[in-house]
Amino acid sequence: MEQQNKRGLKRKALLGGVLGSGGLAMAGCEVSPPGGMIGDFLRMGWPSGITPEAVSMGNFWSWVWVAAWIIGIIMWGLMLTAIFSWNAKKAEKRGEGEFPKQLQYNVPLELVLTIVPIIIVMVLFFFTVQTQDRVTALDKNPEVTVNVTAYQWNWKFGYGELAPEFAPAGGDYDGVDEARQASAEASKIDPSGNNPIHGNSKKDMSYLHFNQIETLGTTDEVPVLVLPTNTPIEFNLASADVAHSFWVPEFLFKRDLYAHPEANKSQRVFQIDEIFEEGAFVGRCAEMCGTYHAMMNFELRTVDRETFAEYIAFRDANPDATNAQALEHIGEAPYATSTAPFVSDRTGTRDGENFQTPA
């Protein structure tokens, strides 16, 4: 009897240890998950990240799946063991009663099955908060500030502050367009006046940013946002109308954009340490925003730091030049390569080819 009790305690300890190790596997927030086909499977459709913040989220996501599979296999194993080991037919063949021996009120086992899940949830919560804090932290020293304005159904990107290395004339650079910014400020509504929605109005554009160097999307041309690699970057977001959402899938992160973000208690700024991969990455609006929401794409084009400085210098020296001309100047494809403009009329979408190639 004493030996059976010892065996039972050993089994419970083993079960607790295995379940606990599943919880501790969640602690792999900064440990790279397996690569190859196993890594692809664990990502469950998530793309590879191109920022340190995205890598942190991707690693955490993969290790949560590792822990979930460990716990799932254990629980499925216990369930199947119970199904096939203790059933009425086998008991009848053995000459036993219809029901197996009842083992309720096993206090040690109940404690294990209560405490271990609590520990797993606590570990998961801890590393969720840790990863979230890293992703949302505003502790970088950004060398490029991008002002993002969303509107139905396109995007406007403007360059605000730039580090001296990227500034056209060197030194500190503030890319604000003073005339248009002053006009926007003049539209501000007096909150003490007799105005709708607590003093805010859609005519009030004072919260938006207007810059000297901007890229504006149109129905015929997907806007291409050019950014440097290996550079801390800040994104300042706002909507000119309804709620939108700025999403680059390779960031593994999205942030909603609102009109009057401060009044709506929303954080309009996020930062990234760097983008460590050059290339073209599609960006999308991830918030249902009306009729042509599905067509509201943009492209993120990342280049090295020297090429980005050349791009900014060309845009500054040639204010009437298009973004396509600036991209050609630095040896890049002039139009988006990861997505294409959509045909917006109903008749143009019936053949399944609902996109167009820029002229």
From Swiss-Prot:
Subunit structure: Associates with subunits I, III and IV to form cytochrome c oxidase.
PROSITE patterns reported for this sequence: COX2, COX2_CUA, PROKAR_LIPOPROTEIN
Entry note: cofactor: Binds a binuclear copper A center per subunit.
GO BP annotations, alphabetical order: ATP synthesis coupled electron transport
GO terms of molecular function: copper ion binding; cytochrome-c oxidase activity
Residues linked to a lipid group, N-palmitoyl cysteine type: C29
Broad class of where this protein is predominantly found: membrane
Enzyme class of the recorded protein, top EC level: translocase
Cofactor: binuclear copper center (CuA)
Keywords in alphabetical order: Cell membrane, Copper, Electron transport, Lipoprotein, Membrane, Metal-binding, Palmitate, Respiratory chain, Signal, Translocase, Transmembrane, Transmembrane helix, Transport
Location(s), subcellular: Cell membrane
Membrane topology label: Multi-pass membrane protein
Protein's UniProt name: Cytochrome c oxidase subunit 2
Role according to the record: Subunits I and II form the functional core of the enzyme complex. Electrons originating in cytochrome c are transferred via heme a and Cu(A) to the binuclear center formed by heme a3 and Cu(B).
Presence of keyword Translocase: yes
Keyword rRNA-binding: no
Annotated binding of Cu cation A1, by residue: H244, C285, C289, M296
EC identifiers of the protein: 7.1.1.9
UniProt lineage: Bacteria, Bacillati, Actinomycetota, Actinomycetes, Mycobacteriales
Lipid linkage positions (S-diacylglycerol cysteine): C29
Organism: Corynebacterium efficiens (strain DSM 44549 / YS-314 / AJ 12310 / JCM 11189 / NBRC 100395)
